Regions:
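Alpha-helical segment proximal to the catalytic Tyr-Lys
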Residues: 53, 97-100, 166
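Short, flexible catalytic-loop segment of classical short-chain dehydrogenase/reductase
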Residues: 72, 110-122
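Active-site loop-to-helix junction immediately N-terminal to the catalytic Tyr of the SDR YXXXK motif
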Residues: 74-82, 94, 122
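Active-site loop immediately N-terminal to the catalytic Tyr-X3-Lys motif
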Residues: 73-79, 101-102, 144
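Catalytic Tyr-X3-Lys loop
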Residues: 7-45, 64, 88, 143
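Active-site helix of classical SDR
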Residues: 48, 84
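C-terminal substrate-recognition "lid" of short-chain dehydrogenase/reductases
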Residues: 145-175
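Residue(s) in the substrate-gating loop at a strand-loop-helix junction
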Residues: 68
């Protein structure tokens, strides 16, 4: 993500326009939003253009993209990321149809919440206790926990398997504990 594509608060109020310490929707920059779209959407489209050429007409070829549950349920503060991941999901479904006659399956995984080094500071206080954001996420997740990396791996292996998923294309698979 980019600080120039992220808002400070979950909800906008009219006083936010005059507060220089608050980044609102109106303060998002073209550069910040562009960075997020370039990283996520073009970071999916351009490699697909390059590598799919070699897959045409070959047995067992498939493309697996990485979307996000943000594509379905946008989180507060990160509109550019949610929009970019929606674009990845849409591209996945479009590519599935586009490549269907040349033997290339195209699917995506849509991870929900997983505790990683990248988001640890947002999820845990310095003393290791969960942040208010973590509690909100866990309370909104029916399975009441974060996902485990092995669960991402299992879903990935399923979708790329010619034995298990040879008739599956255009699917964006949620891996989210019911969130």
């Amino acid at each position: 993500n980019s600080p120039k594509a992220t808002t400070t608060k979950e909800y906008f109020s009219k006083e936010d326009i005059d507060d220089e310490n608050i980044i609102s929707f109106f303060d998002l920059t073209k550069e910040g939003v562009g960075f997020v779209f370039d990283l996520n959407f073009l970071g999916t489209l351009l490699p697909t253009q390059e590598f799919a050429k070699d897959m045409i007409g070959k047995k067992g070829c498939n493309i697996l993209n990485i979307s996000s549950m943000n594509a379905y349920t946008p989180l507060t503060k990160i509109p550019a990321y949610s929009g970019a991941k929606s674009a990845v999901s849409n591209l996945t479904q479009w590519l599935a149809v586009h490549f269907s006659k040349v033997g290339i399956r195209v699917n995506a995984i849509a991870p929900g919440f997983f505790s990683t080094n990248q988001n640890k500071a947002l999820l845990c206080n310095k003393d290791g206790t969960p942040t208010a954001r973590t509690n909100k996420i866990i309370n909104a997740t029916p399975m009441e926990r974060f996902g485990e990396i092995d669960e991402l791996i299992g879903a990935t292996l399923f979708l790329i398997s010619d034995n298990a998923a040879s008739f599956i294309t255009g699917v964006v698979l949620p891996i989210d504990g019911g969130f």
